[in-house]
């Protein structure tokens, strides 16, 4: 995966800032996002064309942080386990927070560049090594815990091939480029996990429906002119499709799909002017109505996971 400058800038700001008591820490937000992402990506693996092994562990790297961020503690490696979700394959295999990751299936994990500087390149390279492995084959990880090195074998499960990041600080936005989903840190202060899941499912809907590739194929442009004319219509169509697909993704993951309707009806005002402020996005009222109409078409006895007819649009050009 490629570095994302906006995330890096936000990360520096988060570490430098003094957070108010009500604001979740970066680790707390990362943990909440990891739980939501685990549910959505594993439950909807059958709907994702590109998949990867999912372990339930989140990685970070020393060069994502300013010098001295780890205090006097010497990190076990350049890439570390930030958190492990309970009950996941990583937890069952014995991975723990702060374990250093040295190799993936015998392939060495890159070492952080000596010249320093804030970058997610090292972390991304480690994630790419894992993502490139078979989705359901045993995954041997060479780790360092303290001064001892060992191999821990994780039995992953298939999940959608996409990574997740918290945009730390007061950002209320959310975005997806087809490879990485970024969720604004302020959402974790404003909303509970079920509500944040609506936003995450929407962004995952973009990935499932291949919106980045389809928008590029349609000749869409990003930037100041993206809101106008045919370009604006293309983006609005993609946003509506992601809303509808997101409701199905929620349902497949055990969330109440109607929570998406409730979110836009009751919380839309909190994000209007922030998360979905431009004319490339429908109004909150229109979003709620479209999702309600779509869910009314789902068969009462629909299987889980449900593959809605909407899924076929990922191979069709945007009109």
Which positions does each model-derived feature cover?
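C-terminal capping/extension segments of zinc metalloprotease domains
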Residues: 20-62, 68-75, 127-135, 140, ...
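Bacterial N-terminal signal peptides that target proteins for export
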Residues: 1-8
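Bacterial N-terminal signal peptides
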Residues: 8-16
